[in-house]
Amino acid sequence: MKLLATPEIWFVCGSQHLYGPGPLKQVAANAQKVAAGLAASKKIPLKIVFKALLTTPDEITNLCIEANSDANCAGLILWMHTFSPAKMWIRGLSTLKKPFCHLHTQFNRDLPWGDIDMDFMNLNQAAHGDREAGFLHTRLRLNRKVVVGHWSDAEVQERIGAWVRAARAWHDWQGAKFARFGDNMRFVAVTEGDKVAAELRFGFSTNGYGVGDLVAKVASEGINDRHVDELCAEYEKRYAVAKELRRGGKRHDSLRYGARIELGLRTFLEEGSFKGFTTTFEDLHGLRQLPGLAVQRLMADGYGFGAEGDWKTAALLRAMKVMGEGLDGGTSFMEDYTYHMNPKGHQVLGAHMLEICSTIAATKPSLEIHPLGIGGKEDPVRLVFDAPAGPALNASLIDMGNRFRLLVNEVTAVKTPKLPKLPVARAVWECQPDFKTACAAWIYAGGAHHTGYSYSVTTEMLEDFANIAGIELAVINADTKLGEFKQTLRNNEVYYHLAQGIRV
């Protein structure tokens, strides 16, 4: 994946000097073993580093300051092996800017009932040491994830792994840049938003560039025939290229121009260190084709993308791709396009004009050329494929004016029916809990028609991500009841309006 860092997660253990040097030495040794056990887990995608045993307010504060200033630290895992009086943590945690996960565990899994004495009891106090810590975290109104269970438990490691993926995506957003070619599709509301508020809240910036900047890269002498030849040869190796597009075919020139768009767009993004971008078909002056194939391939390399100027979805898609890195399944830009409203089974056909990522292809994509019927340009080249059946989700990041909301709908993708006259990439899914409830809830929540669609990212990861970001999360799943969902939205309206004023 392009521009993807591999930061660390710091494992931090809390105690106090009350117990003396012997027990503290044992606490440190045990904490290192716990950290090593987590580091060895294949369910956790980043390196877990035992950082410190903290026993004084100054030690705690200094470590939090160090974490803030270390660009390679994506977050902390905190555990209180013994009782660690929480007032010692006030100053440090009040300064901490990195996300943290509170692991409520203990070193030993089973109690040695016949051998327990007071030395054992004093050493293994996480049961109440973590409660003391939890009170302070709650008193300080700190967003965090609490994971409960023995550190060797696969389910515990999986939950930590979900948080680590969210923390990595948050780390990736800090200082990230997204390029907007042109503006919004005209008169569209949901793709608008406050980019200043977004940078304050999320840490990434979005800035506009004239499509002429892209046109100049596409036409650049730095992209010569050899580069185009090599990329076209790669297309023929990776995809089932239509005969008319192959070398010697009557429309091979269209494929070569599509390759030029990819080379120019890739050069622009790499030179500017961008992690994502948007386009709009209403602002393509100087380009012969709508960028289709280029966008699909850049998404497959990890770039975020949003159509029609949708910068929030571009940023969200990048975050979701980071979260899902290394997992089975893929993640793509998506749009709810049209419905199958048969009473025997309601389904959604998801697609876009061209820009669906090939990481969600069920089989080898075909590379084709067809008229688009919108945009007024030459016929664009594009990858055509069906998405696979299986559990998936749609996620949408929207600007509510006074806050941001992350909306998630869990879905079940089904086998795509034959679509011989629809030459675009597509997915078909059934909504949870059902079509009518899910669509009504989505509309009540103000969800966009653009989403990040993923087979690899889970609701838990997105919940952790929203928690780190300090934004509202609304989930539509198999348990959703519309009346309760609407009331939750009303409650959230009040909570997020007041929350900043009651933090202390």
From Swiss-Prot:
Q: Which SUPFAM superfamilies match?
A: FucI/AraA C-terminal domain-like (SSF50443), FucI/AraA N-terminal and middle domains (SSF53743)
One GO term under biological process is: L-arabinose catabolic process to xylulose 5-phosphate
Keywords of the record, alphabetical order, are: Arabinose catabolism, Carbohydrate metabolism, Isomerase, Manganese, Metal-binding
Describe the reaction catalysed, as an equation.
beta-L-arabinopyranose = L-ribulose
The record's EC number reads 5.3.1.4
Involved pathway(s): Carbohydrate degradation; L-arabinose degradation via L-ribulose; D-xylulose 5-phosphate from L-arabinose (bacterial route): step 1/3
The UniProt record gives the binding positions of Mn(2+) as E308, E335, H352, H450
What remark does the entry make about the cofactor? Binds 1 Mn(2+) ion per subunit.
Task: Drop me one GO molecular function for this one.
Answer: L-arabinose isomerase activity
The record, for InterPro entries, names: Ara_Isoase_C, AraA_central, AraA_N, AraA_N_sf, Fuc/Ara_isomerase_C, Fucose_isomerase_N/cen_sf, Lara_isomerase
* Cofactors: Mn(2+)
Q: Which domain of life is it from?
A: Bacteria
Any one Gene Ontology cellular component term annotated for this protein: cytosol
Signal sequence extent: none
Q: What class of enzyme is it?
A: isomerase
Q: What does this protein do?
A: Catalyzes the conversion of L-arabinose to L-ribulose.
Q: Which family does it belong to?
A: Belongs to the arabinose isomerase family.
The record ties this protein, via PANTHER family, to: L-ARABINOSE ISOMERASE
Q: What is the recorded name of this protein? A: L-arabinose isomerase
User: Which species is this record about?
Assistant: Opitutus terrae (strain DSM 11246 / JCM 15787 / PB90-1)
Q: What is the lineage of its organism?
A: Bacteria, Pseudomonadati, Verrucomicrobiota, Opitutia, Opitutales
